[in-house]
Amino acid sequence: MHDILEPRHHMIDYVEFASADPQTMCVFYEATLGWSFEWFGPDYVAFHGAGLEGGIYRADIVSRSADGGALIVLNSRDLEASEALVLSHGANI
């Protein structure tokens, strides 16, 4: 189970990401960032533990920052260690 975040006035409350392969995204984010996931059928999953609640849905067309999509910035207390961790799980930086 997860804690529900208290809604904050005029703050982003929930974000959704399109993915051709939500399962692979979940495996990556769980292994690298410790997020947890709650599936609602095979094509939608909510994520928790990211500092913001959100979801991932299966889609044939996905947004990419290079094409003008949103750029999401994650914080790290140890950038080199975080970089090594995500690279070890197949990320491209």
Name each model feature, range by range.
Residues 35-69:
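Conserved short beta-strand elements that form part of the metal-binding/catalytic scaffold
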Residues 5, 59-64, 92-93:
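A general structural signal for short secondary-structure boundary/capping elements
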Residues 21-22, 72-93:
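Vicinal oxygen chelate
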Residues 1-26, 69-74:
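N-terminal beta-strand motif that seeds the catalytic metal site of vicinal oxygen chelate
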Residues 31-37, 90-93:
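Conserved acetyl-CoA-binding loop of GNAT-fold acetyltransferases
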Residues 25-30, 86:
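Conserved active-site tyrosine of GNAT-family acetyltransferases
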Residues 5-8, 30, 49, 65:
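Generic structural signal for beta-strand residues in well-ordered domains
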